[in-house]
Amino acid sequence: MDAFTRFTNQTQGRDRLFRATQYTCMLLRYLLEPKAGKEKVVMKLKKLESSVSTGRKWFRLGNVVHAIQATEQSIHATDLVPRLCLTLANLNRVIYFICDTILWVRSVGLTSGINKEKWRTRAAHHYYYSLLLSLVRDLYEISLQMKRVTCDRAKKEKSASQDPLWFSVAEEETEWLQSFLLLLFRSLKQHPPLLLDTVKNLCDILNPLDQLGIYKSNPGIIGLGGLVSSIAGMITVAYPQMKLKTR
């Protein structure tokens, strides 16, 4: 209960909750649209999705501040690769929120001289770059974690006077792939924050990929990805120890 209270008291927590609701509506709407007699339910879900999306706009200032703070923190990272990737990713995220704010200003009628499609495409590009850079950082962290697991395993097998598993694997492609996937599984299992961050970024990137026409998805896939990403984000907000730390 304390974790939930702390979660809802944070701007990031409320935004994740609204976001999860929005993508749940999108997913349910996609599943129910082909079914006869569900028109009213689909319409209600569409209205709720729109209302929640509009409500999330009020968290914009908090998101911008959070992105700026994240940029300042990433600059001081000791490792070059995370420092470079996270700084550029957070800068792109700040620009994305600025573009999103400009779109919001147009949508509420404060100005009419804004090209909606142009700014929407700009926002999607910067969001895509932010997620792509975050995934590069995740891949780098995964490679380091896999090296640690390999070394630890080799030490244990050496102390037990056994031949290391990694040197006994046959060179056939299928066995190599199995060994790699097993190592990847063990690496992520031992580092839950890295697993959460990777899953979150992979799910999030589906949306800009679709908007930019790089890889088309249906609303069901985007809704499911957004829901999974939101749940992962909610976990990191409620339990800060599950957030991937910057070294």
Curated annotation (Swiss-Prot):
InterPro entries: PEX11 (IPR008733)
Annotated localization: Peroxisome membrane
Region annotated Required for homodimerization, interaction with PEX11G, and peroxisomal localization, chain positions: 220-239
Gene Ontology BP annotations: brown fat cell differentiation; peroxisome fission; peroxisome membrane biogenesis; peroxisome organization; regulation of peroxisome size; signal transduction
GO molecular function: protein homodimerization activity
Membrane topology: Multi-pass membrane protein
Disulfide bonds: none
Bilayer-crossing regions: 84-105, 220-239
Post-translational modification: Seems not to be N-glycosylated.
GO cellular component term of the entry, any: peroxisomal membrane
Cytoplasmic-side segments: 1-83, 240-247
UniProt entry keywords in alphabetical sequence: Membrane, Peroxisome, Peroxisome biogenesis, Transmembrane, Transmembrane helix
Membrane-side (Lumenal) residue stretches: 106-219
A Pfam family reported for this protein in Swiss-Prot or TrEMBL: PEX11
Domain of life: Eukaryota
This protein's record includes keyword Membrane: yes
Complex formation: Homodimer. Heterodimer with PEX11G. Probably interacts with COPB2 and COPA. Interacts with PEX19. Interacts with FIS1.
Family affiliation: Belongs to the peroxin-11 family.
Known role: May be involved in peroxisomal proliferation and may regulate peroxisomes division. May mediate binding of coatomer proteins to the peroxisomal membrane. Promotes membrane protrusion and elongation on the peroxisomal surface.
Protein name, UniProt field: Peroxisomal membrane protein 11A
Organism this protein belongs to: Homo sapiens
Encoding gene (name): PEX11A
